[in-house]
UniProtKB/Swiss-Prot annotation:
Record remark: domains: Contains a tandem atypical propeller in EMLs (TAPE) domain. The N-terminal beta-propeller is formed by canonical WD repeats; in contrast, the second beta-propeller contains one blade that is formed by discontinuous parts of the polypeptide chain.
One of the Pfam families matching this protein, by short name: Beta-prop_EML
Chief location of this protein within or outside the cell: cytoplasm
Keywords: Coiled coil, Cytoplasm, Cytoskeleton, Microtubule, Repeat, WD repeat
Tissue expression profile of the protein: Ubiquitous.
Organism expressing this protein natively: Homo sapiens (Human)
Region described as Tandem atypical propeller in EMLs: 10-649
PANTHER family recorded: ECHINODERM MICROTUBULE-ASSOCIATED PROTEIN-LIKE 2, WD-40 REPEAT PROTEIN
Gene Ontology molecular function terms on file: microtubule binding; tubulin binding
Localisation: Cytoplasm, Cytoskeleton; Cytoplasm, Cytoskeleton, Spindle
The name this protein goes by in its record: Echinoderm microtubule-associated protein-like 2
Domain of life (superkingdom): Eukaryota
Gene Ontology biological process: microtubule cytoskeleton organization; negative regulation of microtubule polymerization; regulation of microtubule nucleation; sensory perception of sound; visual perception
Homology family: Belongs to the WD repeat EMAP family.
């Protein structure tokens, strides 16, 4: 016996007699068998090697429109800039190319463009490291051409999150305003190039949604949000505020957006669907367009030609207004894309629209809008890659199933299903896709037509894994009811019939891998058990020697000899949500609860193996998979709802 690591427990124990390694998760022993060919030379003290390959972020799927605003702009480079998770995305629609600013370490909440149209400010939320150390909220100022970070503001100053940021527009843009999410929603003004705070003041007890400098008067700022609009004057290092007076007009629950017209008018949109015009320099309403939208006015954009565009929430309309506030043109955004969140001006009469369903659309009020960026709307867990094409499927809590092309970065199709989805798996032919949901229902879909082939129910709990055997003869369905249901499969995945169920786990099924020859499969469960099964009989295989030297078609189980090096010291067994082995058997990628994707060498069987580590996701990373040819890895986010595509380099 030799043990490794002088932690509180012996973290890993190697037994030569049994040919096994035992690791401990939360004090629970997890025994793992060493294949005969590795056993004679195996030692816990061998240093693990870093993988020779790395990951480079190539594409980000998604946009954060659900709960953020004023976060979509066109740059002179022809790129639109927006954010999702902790990534600021610069997307050249013409060249179908993305660049990424990766300076943030947690969710980005706001974005502003400097008048020079090159410098960008982004603000982020407070985060925590894997070790539980706080990561303070702050603003990063960066160059959109070189992607280099120029300045970092407010470390230790902001509380909870930075929710609004804006550059001054007239005096060379040398000031930056920011609002945080502390109880007092502190408004601060910074000389950003010197990284010094000029002044700060309590803004409001209520939510603040917008903070912006006046375009021509560098001493005036406007903030608005829940039941308020304030006009601020910056003088001699202090800020004084005047409240916007609604007088005879109904005071809205929320003032949602603000923009400035050439003559100096300030225009606001509110939750009551009204546009209010505040005369130049004043805090009184000089003109009102009541009921401009049915439901809230979420976005306003003043166009170069002096007209104004507004975007509606409930009514999903984009409306063009003349300089006298008469309606010139309107168009409705299709329901699937969701309510309008923000509107940005493009070249010519092109507009870009961000929606609350995390999509970005391109078009005009004359022609209507088409999809540019498709997003998921809620937590994502299901991910599977096509066995022979550059395609992958994602599905999640939002009941959406998308089949994507990793080349065109667009969905080939999307389908809404009845239940929130949790898992997905392709038949080896690639023509049928299984999708598991949280209710115990699971479906078979035709990947070409996206028609429903079949629908089945096993138990009434979440289906955490659906996996076809490599020979296509079986389908294993792992459930939170601790059982694996086994089906025989005919007609290329179109016909399935239940063979039986595998009972033996004392906790829910988390992961499942098939043997290369389809003769057995292995499962992991919520209490860190590893069990082996014969699909033909649905019986547990209890002989260690029967499975010790088995070649596995995949490595998605987070517990097993080939992968146990992914676990860090003192890890909780729920810290790692998913692993995936590259098809050439050389790489292993893991997805963890700390927003990180790790890349290891495979096999990964030395304790605490070395890895390359990548950020981009901002909450738990829920799944990971390699494309069929190993050219790319894909990862899905939980709360951040994003899908990241990484080139293997």
């Amino acid at each position: 016996m030799s043990s490794f690591g002088a932690g509180k427990t012996k973290e890993v124990i190697f037994s030569v007699e049994d040919g096994s390694v035992k690791m401990f998760l939360r004090g629970r022993p997890v025994p793992m068998m060493i294949p005969d060919e590795l056993a004679p030379t195996y030692s816990l003290d061998t240093r693990s090697e870093l993988p020779s390959c790395r990951l480079k972020l190539e594409w980000v799927y998604g946009y954060r429109g659900r709960d953020c605003r004023a976060n979509l702009y066109l740059l002179p480079t022809g790129e639109i800039v927006y954010f999702v998770a902790s990534v600021a995305v610069l997307y050249s629609v013409e060249e179908q190319r993305q660049r990424h600013y990766l300076g943030h370490n947690d969710d980005i909440k706001c974005l502003a463009i400097h008048p020079d149209m090159v410098t960008i400010a982004t603000g982020q939320v407070a985060g925590t490291t894997k070790e539980g150390k706080p990561l303070p909220p702050h603003v990063r100022i960066w160059d959109s051409v070189s992607l280099s970070t120029l300045h970092v503001l407010g470390l230790g100053v902001f509380d909870r999150a930075v929710c609004c940021v804006g550059f001054s527009k007239s005096n060379g843009g040398n000031l930056l305003c920011a609002v945080d999410e502390s109880n007092d929603h502190m408004l601060s003004v910074w000389d950003w190039a010197k990284e010094t705070k000029v002044v700060d003041v309590k803004c409001s007890n209520e939510a603040v949604l917008v903070a912006t400098f006046h375009p021509t008067d560098p001493t005036v700022l406007i903030t608005c949000g829940k039941s308020h609009i304030y006009f601020w004057t910056l003088e001699g290092g202090s800020l004084s505020k005047r409240q916007g007076l609604f007088e005879k007009h109904e005071k809205p629950k929320y003032v949602l957006c603000v923009t400035f017209l050439e003559g100096g008018d300030v225009v606001t949109g509110d939750s009551g669907g009204n546009l209010y015009v505040w005369g130049k320099g004043g805090n009184r309403i000089t003109q009102a367009v009541l009921g401009a939208h049915d439901g809230g006015v979420f976005g306003l954009c003043a166009l170069r030609d002096g007209t104004l565009v507004s975007g509606g929430g409930r009514d999903r309309r984009v409306v063009l207004w003349g300089s006298d506030y008469s309606k010139l043109q309107e168009v409705e955004v299709p329901e699937d894309f969701g309510p309008v969140r923000t509107v940005a001006e493009g070249h010519g009469d092109t507009l870009y629209v961000g929606t609350t369903r995390n999509s970005i659309l391109q078009g005009s009020v004359h022609t209507g809008f088409s999809l540019l960026v498709q997003g998921h709307v809620e937590e994502l867990w299901g991910l599977a890659t096509h066995p022979s094409r550059a395609q992958f499927v994602t599905c999640g809590q939002d009941k959406l199933v998308h089949l994507w092309s990793s080349d065109s970065h667009q969905p080939l199709w999307s389908r809404i299903i009845e239940d929130p989805a949790r898992s997905a798996g392709f038949h080896p032919s690639g023509s049928v896709l299984a999708v598991g949901t949280v209710t115990g229902r699971w479906l078979l879909l035709d990947t070409e037509t996206h028609d429903l082939v079949a629908i089945h129910t096993d138990g009434n709990e979440q289906i955490s894994v659906v996996s076809f055997s490599p020979d296509g003869a079986y389908l294993a369905v792992g459930s939170h009811d601790n059982l694996v249901y086994v089906y025989t499969v005919d007609q290329g995945g179109r016909k399935v019939s239940r063979l039986g169920k595998c009972s033996g786990h004392s906790s829910f099924i988390t992961h499942l891998d098939w043997a290369q020859d389809s003769s057995c499969f292995v499962t992991n469960s919520g209490d860190y058990e590893i069990l082996y099964w014969d699909p033909a009989t649905c019986k547990q295989i209890t002989s260690a020697d029967a499975v010790r030297n088995m070649e596995w078609a995949t490595a998605t189980c987070v517990l097993g000899f080939g992968v146990f090096g992914i676990w860090s010291e003192g890890a909780d067994g729920t810290d790692i949500n998913a692993v995936a082995r590259s098809h050439d058997g050389k790489l292993l990628a893991s997805a963890d609860d700390f927003g990180k994707v790790h890349l290891f060498s495979y096999p990964c069987c030395q304790p605490r193996a070395l890895s390359h580590k990548y950020g981009g996701h901002s909450s738990h990373v829920t799944n990971v998979a390699f494309l069929w040819d190993d050219s790319m890895a894909l990862t899905t986010g939980g709360k951040d709802t994003s899908v990241l595509q990484w080139r293997v380099v």
